[in-house]
Amino acid sequence: KIPDSIISISSGYVIVVDKQHQKIYVFHKNSSFSKVFEAACSTGKNPGSKQVAGDAKTPNGIFFVTRILTNPGPTDVYGSMAFPLDYPTISDKRAGRDGNNIWIHGTTKTLLPTQSKGCVVLHDNDLKRLAQYIYFNKTPVIISESLKWISQDKISPVKNELERILTSWHKAFVEKDIKAI
C-alpha cells in the first residue's frame, strides 16, 4: 500500500511525513511505487498545521528542499546537517500563514515524538540515509496530519477522478465560470 497523497507523482522520489504516527517515508516511482526508506521522526509540539511563527506546529502541505546546511548548530539539537524547506509557500502567504526556518534536520539526542518547534527531526544516522533521496527543488516533501493508505491497484481510478476534477476546475477558471468553481 501507498499513501493516497502520492498518486499523482509521475516518477522519482517523494518524501512523506505522517505527523500522527511520527514517521517519515521515501517512495520511489518507476512503473509502480516502492518504499525505499522509513524512519521515526519528531514533528511540532502542538497539533495542527503551522499558522504563525512560534506556534510550534509543523506545516501541512507540499514543500521542496531548497539547500543543505552542514553543521547547522549544536549537533545534539540539529545534527550534522539540515535541509530547509520552502515554507511558507506562495499559497501559505496568501492564506495568511507565516513562519520560517522549517527544516528537516537531525539530532543526536533521544528522539521523542512531537518535540520539535515545527521542524521534522530524525536521528542523525537516519537523516544521513535520507539525504541520498533529496534533490533540491525537485523532490516533493508531503507533510500530512495522517496518511490514508491505498493499494496500488486502486491508483488508476482515483488518479483519473482527480484529473477529471482538476480539468473541470481549470476549464471553469479559464472561462471565469465562478458558479462551476
Residue ranges and their predicted role:
Residues 177-181:
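Short, well-ordered alpha-helical segments enriched in acidic and aromatic residues
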